[in-house]
Amino acid sequence: MTDDRMADIYAAVRLGGVNREAARQALRMLWDQLGTDGEPLHRSVVAHHLADLQDTAEEALLWDTRALDSAFVPGIPLDDGLLGFLPSLYLSLADSHRLVGDFDVARMQLALARGHASVLADDAYGRVIRAGVDHVATLLAAESTDRVAC
């Protein structure tokens, strides 16, 4: 079931490269299906990718916040999948806060992303997240609210 659910999630994410609205609808349907009792990793991944598909920085911030909140469920310890996902979640939150001009909170979230980066492997994913942290740090230093690819 878990593998099937992740396959559904990543199929919806892949739609984003072709049709953002279809991807947004598919992920929103998965979010609704998962409900509040869905697996934390599934909920977190869906919300994280929904954030990337929003039209405004404010909407993206809302979904990035949901993604992080979904990772932390009282009484459920973080598994390895979520631990490895935290740097990306904090990085996305940092960038969303930067985009809305909340630079102090963005810096705090970026520090958390850096602090959790030690769990990342020295692979393509780890390098992308570390480069994203450096990129957002540069944008924060300039107090830029420009939307740019990370």
Q: What residue ranges belong to the model's regions?
A:
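Residue signature of alpha-solenoid helical repeat architecture, marking inter-repeat boundaries
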Residues: 2-3, 41, 84, 124
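TPR repeat positional signature
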Residues: 8-9, 44-47, 83, 90, ...
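Helix-turn-helix repeat elements of alpha-solenoid scaffolds
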Residues: 16-29, 57-73, 109-111
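Flexible helix-coil transition and linker loops at the boundaries of alpha-helical arrays
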Residues: 32-39, 72-82, 119-123
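Alpha-helical adaptor scaffolds
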Residues: 43-83
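Alpha-helical linker/edge segments of TPR/alpha-solenoid repeat scaffolds
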Residues: 57-60, 88-96, 133-150
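Preference for long, well-ordered alpha-helical segments
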Residues: 105-147
